[in-house]
């Protein structure tokens, strides 16, 4: 079964990636992703300067997924830019992904200008959706600000750019955000980031399980798959065909990957399950996806991608 895919001018061996934030903080972790069976990998979301992130404990595995309030810990944009530029020289045929986010409007502009002015030629993921910065609202929930920011960005940014979105829950919001995104030459939309401000409780101890924000944190894993599929489907129906979709949320097995693709995703990112299982997860997911395709008689992804049937 052929599970390869074309994306941003490159042919990838399969549709699988890590989600930024998982197993991609250090050179060692990124090298492990590069050596894995993932079709591509994205670096940790970088800020202009290194960040420690929120207080620990800030991540907790639950029976159905995870809750986290990491607070964007990272080693700074220079670290990840230098790493990807070095790989670019060593493996020029490889598709590379950076991920960036500023702490405010000005930092978002500044960090993208830094990428624009660098030697880096790969794809940049602009994170508009971190739910775990105390006192900082998610940019993408402010439609007017999102449009203003992207308008300014595309006055100078000429390299491939995608955006990572939070989950939306209202049809009117899908309509409004898609209308904004369709105005810009985006390579892709990544949907979804974790569902913000969930609460998981240890009933034996009668306390929360993570420290930041009084225990409130972003949900991942099986909890979020129906919401992720809905967002992938909604944007697949609304975005112009030039804007691809990366589906993220709730990937535990090949069936989950298949469903994201069926809803219209071109690539699929794995977060919680990668954290729990390690980079070997990609080999398992690829095998399970191929088994599903074989059972259904599909020989390539494009035979079923985006072809979810309605009743």
Swiss-Prot record:
Cofactor requirements of the protein: FMN
Subunit structure: Homodimer.
Protein name in UniProt: Probable dihydroorotate dehydrogenase A (fumarate)
Binding residue positions for substrate: 44, 68-72, 127, 193-194
Gene Ontology BP terms: 'de novo' pyrimidine nucleobase biosynthetic process; 'de novo' UMP biosynthetic process
Locations listed in the record: Cytoplasm
Enzyme class per UniProt: oxidoreductase
Cross-referenced CDD domains: DHOD_1A_like
Catalytic activity: (S)-dihydroorotate + fumarate = orotate + succinate
Major localization listed first in the record, in broad terms: cytoplasm
Purpose of the protein: Catalyzes the conversion of dihydroorotate to orotate with fumarate as the electron acceptor.
Free-text remark on how the cofactor is bound: Binds 1 FMN per subunit.
GO molecular function, one term: dihydroorotate dehydrogenase (fumarate) activity
PROSITE patterns assigned to the protein according to its UniProt record, in alphabetical order: DHODEHASE_1
Chain residues that bind FMN: 20, 44-45, 127, 164, 192, 221, 249-250, 271-272
GO cellular component term, pick one: cytoplasm
Family the entry assigns: Belongs to the dihydroorotate dehydrogenase family. Type 1 subfamily.
Pathway: Pyrimidine metabolism; UMP biosynthesis via de novo pathway
Keyword Transport in annotation: no
Active-site residues (renumbered): 130
